[in-house]
Amino acid sequence: MARIPLEFLSITLPVLLLAYCLAIEYEVSLPTIAHTSPASNPEEYLQSIYEQLNLDLPSTCTVNHLSAFDNTPTSLLNFSTSPVEHFDAPKLPSGLNATAGEQWAFDGTSSSGRSGLLLGIYRDASYAFLGPGNFRLSLDLVWDNSTTWSTVDYLSSSTVHTCTDKVVGIWSHSADHYYVFTVTADAKHARIHFHTPDVVGAVDLYSTTPARYPDGALFPSEVSVTQNAPMLHWVEPIPGGLIDVDLKVKDTPFRWTGLGGHERWWSAKGWLDLMTHWEAVRLMAGPYVLSFWQPTSRVNGVAYPSAFLTKYGEKVFSAVSGKVSEVEDYILYSPVRMEKQARETGYEVELVSPAQGRRWVFGLEYRNQEFEFELGDAAGGRAYVGRAKGGEVHADDKPEEPSEGVFFIEHVDVKALTVPRAYVVVSFEFGPPIHGADIWVAC
């Protein structure tokens, strides 16, 4: 459901440490970063984007526009914790500082259980020391034949329109290079447009579930909270629904339908400062939709599970505990391994409600890996798509006729990883330039 492009750090950090040592050894003078400039005036190309997509945005919409290299605010940020504000409205509207950030995320799994999509759209200064600015987009794709493709794109501007009937977000670099998402006020429909040199097309997501808070309460609720773990806020505008993907990636078709979902995160610090691990599952099997998110806090070492199950679009279960209880609803989440295999081949998810006297069990079998990255010291992450099967198990241990479907799952371990705090800028050739910028890397 969520990914930060940590593998980028696994490449840059060793290089940067070497550059730093060489600079110290030979007393090299280190230049400053040359910031990337947009291809044209944002006001001009934004108008072109509105016209291309026939976006009719009334003047009553609240417009929040930020640039990738805006100065860091020195005063306290406006950090929204309102439980009744539109989930997709900006939570840091006054700007970003060196730590706080927010993310809009979308994911999908094909009905075959073999293709998948994971999209993260960020306003986040966590990687500002790398130089390309505060607005990035990560996209991971896997085709039925196991081919994968990933990109991290840095944009020049971010504009979010909050209207009475929808929220529209535009991450752009020019009239020919942009991403646009639209989410309706009732969170029943989301659409993402892609228009870049590499990816063109659109993704539509139709919710079959109610928007929800970390505690499982349904939106809107004036008494619920958006905080999921210390300094981390998370809500689900679309816990699950039907997705229609119609993209072309470097002229290769990427088209399918299946399961999709949409998440929102915002936090007072970067993810590496706040979490050591996180797990995520989204599943659709027959009438059931399950969403599960569990971060483990670096602040106190505690895991914060949030499980939510619907049947025919109605909530039947939620839990914020991962421990067996005779009173409290809980989720058990365990890997399945074949004999003599070090890695799991799937997972089993068990949901138990002692108060209702009900239990649901779902088996998840991996079909394709969507991404994997290793960062050393046991740090890294993996995501899979696959087939799901399960349903309710009655008191006599006789399960209902099992339902079949698909899932997305993600595991990330960054316990041994931290973002460096001493930043040094070096200038040498490293990979392709970003939007025509000078070649540089920053630590």
Curated annotation (Swiss-Prot):
Its EC number is 5.5.1.-. Residues 1-23 form the signal peptide. GO terms for molecular function: isomerase activity. It comes from the Eukaryota. It is an enzyme of class 5 (isomerase). Pathway: Secondary metabolite biosynthesis. It holds the Pfam family DA_C. SUPFAM superfamilies: AttH-like (SSF159245). Glycans are attached at N78, N97, N145. The keyword Hydrolase does not apply. This is Diels-Alderase poxQ. Belongs to the Diels-Alderase family. The gene is poxQ. Keywords: Glycoprotein, Isomerase, Signal. Induction: Expression is positively regulated by the oxaleimides biosynthesis cluster-specific transcription factor poxB. InterPro entries: DA_C. Diels-Alderase; part of the gene cluster that mediates the biosynthesis of oxaleimides, cytotoxic compounds containing an unusual disubstituted succinimide moiety. The first step of the pathway is provided by the HR-PKS poxF that serves in a new mode of collaborative biosynthesis with the PKS-NRPS poxE, by providing the olefin containing amino acid substrate via the synthesis of an ACP-bound dec-4-enoate. The keyword Iron does not apply.
